């Protein structure tokens, strides 16, 4: 590697909106994020099921005559 052309690689703290803190190394430094593996629904298993039955019925009613 050439000396003097690479960015400084230093300790970094990543803080999530939920309060989780991750210590790592980065060229960016410390920063915050909105979601992490501690609070993201995919990792926590707390998926939200949306009720879209009304929308589906409205779509079918609107385009019922288009296929005939």
Curated annotation (Swiss-Prot):
One of its GO terms (molecular function) is structural constituent of ribosome. Binds 1 zinc ion per subunit. Keywords: Metal-binding, Ribonucleoprotein, Ribosomal protein, RNA-binding, rRNA-binding, Zinc. Gene3D superfamilies: Ribosomal protein L31. Pfam families: Ribosomal_L31. Disulfide bonds: none annotated. Zn(2+) binds at residues 16, 18, 36, 39. The keyword Ribosomal protein applies. It comes from the Bacteria. Its cofactor is Zn(2+). InterPro entries: Ribosomal_bL28/bL31-like_sf, Ribosomal_bL31, Ribosomal_bL31_A, Ribosomal_bL31_sf. One of its GO terms (biological process) is translation. One of its GO terms (cellular component) is ribosome. Part of the 50S ribosomal subunit. Belongs to the bacterial ribosomal protein bL31 family. Type A subfamily. Binds the 23S rRNA. This is Large ribosomal subunit protein bL31. The gene is rpmE.
